[in-house]
Amino acid sequence: MSGYRLDKGGLLIDRAKEIAFRFDGKTHEGHAGDTLASALLASGQTLFGRSFKYHRPRGLYSAGPEEPNALVELRPGPHQVPNTRATMVELHDGLEANSQNRFPSLGFDLMAVNDRFSRFLSAGFYYKTFMGTGQPVWHFFEHFIRRAAGLGRARHDADPDRYEKTNAFTDVLIVGAGPAGLMAAKAAADAGKRVLVVDENAQAGGRLWDEGGEVDGLPTHEWARAAIADLEARGNVTLLLRTCVYGYYDDNILGASERVSEHKKTPDAFE
């Protein structure tokens, strides 16, 4: 492993289990429990992407779903998924990821020349420069401008993945399984309510795994383990991890999307 990784700490990783993965064609190693972002950082990778327009170098900005820079393309072939946040990708055997929005490579991006001409490429420059000169001129340059725009590339062939939907009914829905969410779930469960706890991360507990201090006289991570175990043992509580609630609609209907198999090299038969 690289010397960039701390010798201790990291409660969610298993240092005894090493995992090989590939990024931009190069093989790296991480640990079980790593995200793609944390494993790349530990390997000495600090450049994760290029800015949308001027292709300026970009590194990690955050450690979760709010990450704006480290957008990668996962899985080769028809299962390809673009624009995935490296901070949300769980490391697993066989993981293949590629950077986006660069040519020919992340470290040497010819499109970075745009930065040299940024004064001439202000917002909406193409409307003033090309569209006012007549249709033939715009139609000529439109092809090149559209090819330079965007981040990841979507495939044009059929999507071979399967998507299922279901309905769940509950008395109390809690979005976010951090300390407040876990406490709220326990209180509702103690009152005899049917409780559904949803969190987009792979592990409940939120910042309790990262921050020091105590909760109810226990270190934060120990309290998190105990609270999660308590909720999992209750028949009236359901924990849904890797699930993002994306909308709140009329009549108390909420929409949620669960990542079922993205963290596995070989999904189960019906995933």
Where in this protein do the model-derived segments appear?
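Signature of N-terminal electron-transfer/Fe-S-associated modules in redox systems
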Residues: 1-151, 159
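Ferredoxin-like iron-sulfur electron-transfer modules
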Residues: 22, 160-169
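Residue-level detector of anion-binding/catalytic polar loops
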Residues: 46, 194-196, 238
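Feature captures the FAD/FMN-dependent oxidoreductase FAD-binding
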Residues: 112, 148-152, 166, 173, ...
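N-terminal Rossmann-like FAD-binding beta1-loop-alpha1 element of flavoenzymes
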Residues: 166-196
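Glycine-rich FAD pyrophosphate-binding loop
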Residues: 190-209
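Glycine-rich phosphate-binding loops of nucleotide-dependent enzymes
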Residues: 214
